[in-house]
């Protein structure tokens, strides 16, 4: 039997807590920073992978900027572009935060669907306000 997923369905991710994790070749996983950050409304941040890790074939993203006012651990999207598995050990430095001071305070600091996250959080795109507006128009 086939099933389909619409953007209104939440995907349940399997949580893995181990001292090491093997990312198979050409595979994607979600991870979480150890650090819990609280950004004031005049500082933004983004995450950059470390060069040594990138040279192993591990791509690290965090879906863009960490918004001013964000509080929580940052979810990372990790992709192994290598043809071999990559083993990551707990507490290994794989990325770094870059903090940017803004010229002024944010008009609307972050209070979104990921605020206060303490763990790896899957996509909550189904909670996007523009998606909800489109769904209501169709009804």
Language-model segments: residues:
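DUTPase catalytic domain/fold
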Residues: 1-139
